[in-house]
Amino acid sequence: TQINSISDFTRFMVAIAARSGELLNYSSVAQDVGVSIDTIKRWTGILQTSGIVYLLQPYSNNHLKRAIKTPKSYMLDTGLMAWLTKWLTPETIQQGAKNGQFFESFVVSEIIKSFYNHGMEPPIYFYRDTNQKEIDLLIERDGRLYPMEIKLNDKPSHAQKNFLVLAPEESRIPYY
């Protein structure tokens, strides 16, 4: 795959960094960068292969028919993410409008890297359905799902209510 315009590719990198932790909308990125959707898909593949971006797939099974199918993209290097988005000081990262998004990207990237460092493909997903119920991260181990809600505040909402979409009442999974 060839990159014909470094300036277009740089705008693409900034757009992907600014959207880290969000559903990957190829059309929106293509519009912002001014290139085709196919080009965005190719360039995303380059970032995946290079270990710069991870596409977190949505979790679904037969029971969860309303689950969305679009992956979320995460920058695996939050230092690069900060540089590309010009969030260059700790204060900007901690107090800026996207501080929660940055924190979620950091946590997810560290979990992904932990699995990679143990020679494992990360058995991780996220969940969101058409009713806007969302679980930030699901880790699948030994046939069980471990849901995680990632929040950057000292009074997180009761996220476990969203965990209940994963199983019928009689077979609820534990949440921690």
Residue positions per predicted region:
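Conserved helicase/translocase motor-coupling segment
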Residues: 1-49, 55
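A cross-kingdom feature that marks ATP-driven nucleic-acid transaction machinery
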Residues: 45-53, 57-176
